[in-house]
Amino acid sequence: MKEGKFTFEGTVEQPLLYGLATEEMDWPAQLFLENVPMEVSMTKEGESLSVKGSAVNDLFLGNAEKVFAPGFSIDSLVSQYPDNPAAAFYLYRYFTYQLPLDQLKATRAKLAPALASSPYVQDLDAIIARLEKVQIGQVAPDFSLPDTAGVSVSLADFRGKYVLLDFWASWCPPCRRENPNVVKAYEENKDKNFTIIGISLDNNREKWLKGIADDHLTWTHLSDLKYWDSEIPALYGVRAIPSNMLLDPNGVIIAKDIREEALHETLREVLK
């Protein structure tokens, strides 16, 4: 760098998001690299980032805050810029699990075929494929995880019972707030061919076990202690917790993300 300026040259296979950082920055500034001349300016601290000469960055930086605003329509963005990788990125990164599956698929279908090789689109397609397998009416995919004693337990072991798969973690405040409600549901229905399997996204065994004890969670608990790197949340399309699924005795998903009073109402209807 000389007098606050530098240049670099190269090519990329396709536009992707990269980080640009200085020693003064706590976190890299994000921008897309594409095969066009670009002029980038920002402070040493990473503030006031601007990029000239890049249509992808025009869309990316121009919507960096808008995507979080109430009323933002990702469908409108994709419809207007179907061949822009930044639109595909925003759909994948922020709306994959916010949109109902049918709406997600409809918006995905509006992306230009030229973006099919984008890793954002490929990851989005993989997520859609997983979500299609865990919709209401589908048989929940089997899995095995260690319990609190380190013994491998499979979902198939519970076939014949109504099962609530409860995704949570000891570090998750909303999960901990919901736990008393789940405890109440368990105590009221545990003698009605109903049980709960807690699947934790913890990565610390001691904190996991302490959370179970502190919240009086007396049902089966499983975790590979891999945090979000666990394969099971991905298998079930879980990207935020708390999350749950209610399975019938045949392992068919009959309800999803039922919390607070909705949990009790659903169980009363199903277990009557």
Predicted regions and their residues:
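Thiol/disulfide oxidoreductase modules built on the thioredoxin-like
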Residues: 217, 224-270
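N-terminal "domain-start" segment that seeds a small globular fold
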Residues: 122-155, 219-220, 266-268, 272
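Thiol-based oxidoreductase modules, predominantly thioredoxin-like and allied folds used
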Residues: 192-206, 217-228
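N-terminal targeting signals for export/organelle localization
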Residues: 38-40, 49-51, 57, 68-139
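Conserved helix-turn-beta segment immediately C-terminal to the redox Cys motif
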Residues: 177-199, 269-272
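A non-transmembrane, solvent-exposed segment enriched in polar/low-complexity residues
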Residues: 1-80
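Conserved redox-active cysteine motifs that mediate thiol-disulfide chemistry
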Residues: 159-160, 167-184
